[in-house]
Curated annotation (Swiss-Prot):
It comes from Enterococcus faecalis (strain ATCC 700802 / V583). GO terms for biological process: D-xylose metabolic process. Homotetramer. This is Xylose isomerase. The active site is at H99, D102.
Amino acid sequence: MVYFPKIEKIKYEGTNTKNMYAFRHYNSEEIIMGKTMKEHLRFAVAYWHTMTQDGSDPFGKAVNKRSWLGESPMETAKKRVIAFFEILEKLDVEYFCFHDIDIAPEGNSLKEFFSNIDEITDLIKEKMDETGIKLLWNTANMFSNPRYVNGAASTNNANVYAIAAAQVKKGLDVSKKLGGENYVFWGGREGYETLLNTDMKFEQDNIARLFKMAIFYGEKIGHKPQFLIEPKPKEPSKHQYDFDAATTMAFILKYGLEKDFKLNLEANHATLAGHTFEHELNVARNYGALGSIDANQGDVLLGWDTDEFPTNVYDVTLAMYEILENGGIEPGGINFDSKVRRSSFEMEDLLLAHIAGMDTFARGLKSAMKLKEDRFFEDLKEQRYSSFKKGIGAKIISGKENLESLTNYALKNDEPIIESSHIEYVKNILNDYLY
């Protein structure tokens, strides 16, 4: 069955096009700094928002029109696979991502759930072999089922912990089966409501134990994806242990996981943590731990995870600059963890929304390339920190100074002359680079 019969494969037509179903900026084969746009951006489509989100919210029922709903959960699951790969092919997107419960119904037992996963991943593998589309990453949903009300790896119930471990094992088996390049952990329930009844160290020790089990099992089955942790400060938990990039890096380093784990960073999660997206990317990059990103945007006027499709060229430009500074993001990618707005309920809105996101990242990539070619930020920073290139500054950097010698220097010299940073001018010039 064809689900989008009136929509052809999306092609690049430039900014003068009147065709809704065309890329205005994303030209997959355009060469940017020695690589094609497709190689730089490594786009992925998220199975959950694309295939399972129905448009309902706490105040209203489902509104999304979807023609792949079947008479049984397994029939719906199979139809979703066919429709999903049609979307991927029409967008010419090479990668996809999913949680286990996105693709297969849980059924009435863990055994039935795993059997359903096996059947659906057989179909997914057929479509992957047929199309050449690849799995960027998969993960286990260990936050939706009521059993995880007190956490998965951080739970107070050992039997729940065992089920979480079983889901991770199955997830890694599926990752090997489908050739997954990364494997993600997101701890939506790994946190606490109150410290009154919480042993934080015990819970974090147990989370680390599960991560080490995952590393060991991957090695045992001969499959070594890049493991990724996705930070988020809150929602659904009041206080999540993977609060932001810096907090998560502290966890990774404390438990000696840095050889196997990097970060999967989401723009909207940065907003919830009180950071810009480029801040989170910069922190991860400085640790050598920028692994992959979830592309979306939040609404700074709202206090929850809105997961809007990214259309802010300014923010995306600064994000792409960090990725270029990182030398790229492979084997990670740019996964659209984004959902259409409730009023965008037609099936074709799924394609239009991804076109918008892909065009925005293409513009951000070109803007970031120009910034790098002109050394815009590099020259600014070199000038700003120039006092450390010579004289006493160079001696400080080389380790030749100490508190006593610097005190003597300070006492012999006049009060330093402080220079303006001209921030408003810098921001004004930055606007000239936005395509």
